[in-house]
From Swiss-Prot:
<feature type="domain" description="PPM-type phosphatase">
    <location>
        <begin position="61"/>
        <end position="354"/>
    </location>
</feature>
<dbReference type="GO" id="GO:0005886">
    <property type="term" value="C:plasma membrane"/>
</dbReference>
<dbReference type="GO" id="GO:0045926">
    <property type="term" value="P:negative regulation of growth"/>
</dbReference>
<keyword id="KW-0464">Manganese</keyword>
<feature type="binding site">
    <location>
        <position position="97"/>
    </location>
    <ligand>
        <name>Mn(2+) 1</name>
    </ligand>
</feature>
<feature type="binding site">
    <location>
        <position position="299"/>
    </location>
    <ligand>
        <name>Mn(2+) 2</name>
    </ligand>
</feature>
<keyword id="KW-0904">Protein phosphatase</keyword>
<keyword id="KW-0378">Hydrolase</keyword>
<dbReference type="GO" id="GO:0004722">
    <property type="term" value="F:protein serine/threonine phosphatase activity"/>
</dbReference>
<dbReference type="GO" id="GO:0006470">
    <property type="term" value="P:protein dephosphorylation"/>
</dbReference>
<keyword id="KW-0460">Magnesium</keyword>
<feature type="binding site">
    <location>
        <position position="98"/>
    </location>
    <ligand>
        <name>Mn(2+) 1</name>
    </ligand>
</feature>
<dbReference type="Pfam" id="PF00481">
    <property type="entry name" value="PP2C"/>
</dbReference>
<dbReference type="InterPro" id="IPR036457">
    <property type="entry name" value="PPM-type-like_dom_sf"/>
</dbReference>
<dbReference type="GO" id="GO:0000226">
    <property type="term" value="P:microtubule cytoskeleton organization"/>
</dbReference>
<feature type="binding site">
    <location>
        <position position="345"/>
    </location>
    <ligand>
        <name>Mn(2+) 2</name>
    </ligand>
</feature>
<keyword id="KW-0479">Metal-binding</keyword>
Length: 373
């Protein structure tokens, strides 16, 4: 229980928890956890209004930029939420890449609902783990760890968000969906959750002093062995069109639809029973002094820019707030050279800097929210 004390104490400063005593005089974990989750829900309007800045911009801690492609409305959106969950050492970042007729609405809906849902689930599971240190969430005999808490929180959140999206009265997600690539930084640890084919890349300093790119996520494409096996096992099909060699897509068993170029996504209920899932891959990394920054970007960037090129572009940008925009601009130029004749995709980038510059720190930017619509 000791290794959870600092986390729980931090929450206690932000959320008033009345611990209920049972007949034995012990704290009832379930009631305390339920109350914590209830408190979070009550604060939803506060979290969306006063104390948070809704702007299209960047600062010395994070840089955001999004550019519409040549296929119509920009279906990408992004979010950086500093002071996530009223915790000074936490930040939430996300890239959401929509697709289909309602893709831009789906992406915004997931962006708007995921952070708060994640926060509620995290608080509830954290309270249970703190008050019941032997709690076993994954069928093992091990005590639950911080990573287990975040993983279970993400799994519950993604399942809930996808279910709510399916029953949304104003958004038709049957043939539309979105990816979701998110990061939570908590102190000196980052937790990465990925649904879809957006990508997170870390810039790490090598022993020789140069920056090297470390890919933190998998691009969940239908031709990945484990993804293809699942899809075929659910009677879905995976193949490329004649005019798109190398672009594997997911198809219904008896129809030439929907042709989805990813194996995980929110929405797209026309193909969910045939192997598409919204289950995130969740990983963690302990931040070292050699870890400089993380780039989150939609697939439009990675179609024309390599991981190494991306970190070199960002690291060579003199001013941090301009880093995301410069990377997008370089990707636009690369697209025109490498993919001439193809309509340019939407391009969105979040750059999260892991160490403060002389004029920036997490505490100085506490409670700022940056949104790109």
């Amino acid at each position: 229980m000791g290794h959870f004390s600092s986390m729980f104490n931090g929450l206690a400063r932000s959320f008033s928890i009345k611990k209920v005593k049972n007949n034995n005089g012990n704290c009832d974990a379930k009631e305390a956890a339920d109350e914590m989750a209830s408190e979070a829900k009550k604060k939803e309007l506060i979290l969306k209004s006063s104390g948070y800045v809704n702007v299209q911009g960047s600062n010395n801690l994070a840089s955001l930029f999004s550019k519409r492609g040549e296929k119509g409305v920009n279906q990408d959106c992004a979010l950086v939420w500093e002071g996530f969950g009223c915790q000074e050492d936490m930040i939430f970042c996300g890239i959401f890449d929509g697709h289909g007729p309602w893709g831009h609405y789906v992406a915004k809906q997931v962006r708007n609902s995921m952070p708060l849902s994640l926060l509620c689930n995290w608080q509830k599971i954290l309270a249970q783990a703190t008050l019941e240190p032997e709690l076993d969430l994954e069928g093992s005999n091990k005590k639950i760890s911080r990573f287990d808490i975040w993983k279970q929180s993400y799994l519950k959140t993604c399942a809930t968000v996808d279910q709510e999206l399916e029953h949304h009265r104003k958004i038709d997600s049957y043939y539309s969906g979105t990816t979701a690539l998110t990061i939570v930084r908590q102190g000196e640890v980052i937790y990465v959750a990925n649904v879809g084919d957006s990508r997170a890349v870390l810039a790490m300093e090598s022993d020789e002093g140069s920056l090297v790119a470390v890919q933190l996520t998998l691009d969940f494409k239908p031709n990945l062995p484990q993804e293809k096996e699942r899809i075929i096992g659910c009677k879905g099909r995976v193949f490329c069109l004649d005019d798109e060699p190398g672009v594997h897509r997911v198809w219904q068993p008896d129809a030439e639809t929907p042709g989805l170029a990813m194996s995980r996504a929110f929405g797209d209920y026309c193909i969910k029973e045939y192997g598409l899932v919204s289950v995130p891959e969740v990983t963690q990394r302990h931040i070292s002094t050699k870890d400089h920054f993380i780039i989150l970007a939609s697939d439009g960037i990675w179609d024309v820019i390599s991981n190494q090129e991306a970190i070199e572009i960002v690291s060579s940008t003199a001013e941090r707030p301009k880093a995301a925009k410069r990377l997008v601009e370089q990707a636009v130029r690369a697209w025109k050279k490498k993919r001439r004749g193809y309509s340019m995709d939407d391009m969105s980038v979040v750059c999260l800097f892991l160490h403060s510059s002389s004029s920036s720190s997490l505490s100085q930017h506490h409670h700022a929210m940056t949104i790109l619509k």
